[in-house]
Amino acid sequence: MQADRIYCGDALTVLKTLPDSSVNCCVTSPPYYALRDYGVDGQIGREETPALYVECLTSIFREVRRVLTPDGTLWLNIADTYAGKGNQGEALDPKYPNGRTGQIVALNGKVEGCKAKDMIGVPWLLAFALRADGWYLRSDIIWQKANPMPESTKDRPSRCYEHIFLLSKSRRYYYNAAAVAEPVAESTPARMRRGFGAGNKYSADIPGQKHQHINDHRPDGYAASEIPQLRNKRDVWQINTVPYRGGHFAAFPLKLAETCLLAGCPPGGVVLDPFLGSGTTAAVARQLGRHYIGIELNPDYCKLAQKRIEGGEAHEQTLAPAAVYRRGAGIAGTEKGHPKSGQAHEEAGKGRGEDTQENREEKAARR
């Protein structure tokens, strides 16, 4: 198997050709149910019912789980859809055609078990199906958008978020919390120095002294250990959508892909995106020193993604039938002799004879 490669074809068909345990992480955003027509046969999201849509994606992610290393994770972005009256559901403002979600394509808007105007609950239908299929459902991350697309509805709040589900192949998996840690609030250090007295909720995390006040340990009010300046990343991520002029309806924000990759894919590892679209996951992987495997059904998007990867954030595109695109050499057994997927992060730093901070962080990332 070769890394740094885009396969142009059906996701399930291509995935079946990939070897077991060959990628470290999957970051992807499949086409949402009944929201877009991407103009190619065999596209996902045009199924007659949500149940068929979920069934189709479950079979694809079953193959994703097979090709993941035992400590691999899946970062799955998905949004919901509303049931309609038999012709279509609710739509966004048609004046804004390049949003992450958009005008609903008319299928059969009636959904079994749902009334007209009901929120279908597609993200959770899919999440529960994946859990039942063997995935560990670890987190429901809310992607909050300060610049959401306008909606024409007047009888409910406008949507400003999507889901990112973190799922793992095994109970123990790679997650680099340090790589995505976020700054604590400015008021936190001062409150910690004041201690656990009336009106304060902070106490020192010192073995054997569960309720010891922080300000009891040093005269200046600091604890014996340094007051942390970073905290574990929360599960609400504020990331704005960014218009992409390359002709793809639903470009993934670079920052969103970056966060998932830093947390879920070790340096030198391989990330998979079976719904590559305009190539955001692959482009970010290359920038961060990771390898990528991309799969995309639409030949035009295959070419667009390759141009974007090679030119950074290049917006030009040459629309032509695409075969298989590749960059550089492969992973194992190739002329450049890259380590096998899943081994790169384990072997980093070996032979140097020292316990470096980088190595310690890598070890800590394995839960």
Label every model-predicted segment.
Residues 1-312, 320, 331-355, 359-367:
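Core catalytic lobe of class I
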Residues 323-325:
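Juxtamembrane/interface motifs at transmembrane-helix termini
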Residues 328:
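Acidic, PIN/NYN-like endoribonuclease modules and their adjacent C-terminal/linker elements
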